[in-house]
């Protein structure tokens, strides 16, 4: 949370200083618009845990499902136009995907012995999480020389989250004396839509140009965030954040 606040304050400061810096550089952005395509990584973490208690063989059993999703690869594309001087209006889309292994643990009562629960420990492999977002951005371009410029931007973000979640567990007895128990998880793809925000910066260096277009290479940083909930065991829901710190490189087209 502290890192998010610091990032937000830094970007806001850049926004405040950008017009003054552009004036100091003595340039108004001359291009009519841009198309950016990039690849990178989203750095973020979402740890989820759900605990349920249920009657089993006349006693109370406990099941715990946990999963932690971390950084994933990212694809990003954006387009925008100059609306006034160095002010731009644009829209961007990013897609990020990663997977993880979840864990199922618990204490399961015995059908034979009272107050002698069996310990359950099982791995749930290949839980997928896919994040998509559309960002509407207002930006300000700061030209630095003839070939290099930096654009700072921000605006609302509209996220779509598709995530695999363990929503139920079927238990099965093993062994002649019921000493062990196994679990077969029910995996459900949970889908959520949520609105958040984004702030960021994009740097471009032009490597080739003619009378119509300019081509370049660039890098970007974006911090995007929204919060929602996902269903886990039974009817329980757990909070999760989407977005995070995003970094990447790509190609730039100016027209």
Name each model-derived stretch:
Residues 34-36, 242-255:
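Outer-membrane beta-barrel "beta-signal"
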Residues 86-89, 148, 209-215:
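Repeated loop/turn-to-beta-strand initiation elements of outer-membrane beta-barrel proteins
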Residues 77, 136-138, 152, 199-203, ...:
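Membrane-embedded beta-strands of outer-membrane beta-barrel proteins
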Residues 35-43, 91-95, 152-158, 203, ...:
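Transmembrane beta-barrel strands of outer-membrane/channel proteins
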Residues 20-84, 89, 254:
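Short glycine/proline- and aromatic-enriched beta-strand/turn motifs that initiate or cap beta-hairpins
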Residues 41, 81, 140-142, 203-207, ...:
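Residue-level signature of outer-membrane beta-barrel architecture
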Residues 44-71, 94-133, 159-195, 226-246:
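Extracellular/periplasm-exposed beta-strand and loop segments of Gram-negative cell-envelope proteins
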Residues 1-31:
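Cleavable N-terminal export/targeting peptides
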């Amino acid at each position: 949370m502290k890192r998010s606040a610091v990032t937000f304050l830094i970007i806001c400061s850049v926004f405040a200083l950008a017009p003054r810096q552009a004036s100091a550089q003595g340039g108004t952005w001359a291009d009519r618009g841009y198309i950016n395509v990039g690849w990178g990584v989203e750095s973020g973490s979402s740890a989820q845990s759900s605990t349920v208690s249920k009657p089993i063989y006349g006693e109370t059993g406990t099941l715990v499902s946990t999963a932690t999703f971390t950084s994933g690869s990212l694809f990003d594309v954006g387009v925008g136009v100059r609306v006034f001087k160095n002010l731009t209006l644009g829209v961007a889309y990013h897609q990020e995907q990663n997977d993880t292994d979840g864990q199922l643990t618990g204490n399961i009562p015995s059908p034979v012995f009272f107050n002698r629960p069996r310990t359950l420990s099982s791995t749930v492999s290949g839980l997928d999480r896919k994040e998509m977002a559309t960002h509407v951005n207002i930006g300000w371009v700061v030209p630095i020389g003839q070939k290099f410029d930096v654009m700072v931007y921000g605006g609302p973000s509209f996220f779509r989250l598709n995530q695999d979640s363990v929503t139920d567990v079927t238990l099965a007895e093993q062994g002649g004396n019921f000493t062990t128990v196994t679990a077969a998880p029910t995996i459900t793809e949970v889908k959520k839509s949520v609105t958040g925000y984004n702030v960021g910066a994009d740097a471009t260096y032009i490597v080739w140009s003619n009378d119509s277009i300019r081509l370049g290479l660039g890098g970007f940083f974006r911090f995007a965030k929204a919060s929602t909930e996902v269903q886990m065991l039974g009817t329980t829901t757990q909070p999760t954040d989407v977005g995070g710190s995003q970094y990447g490189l790509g190609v730039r087209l100016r027209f």
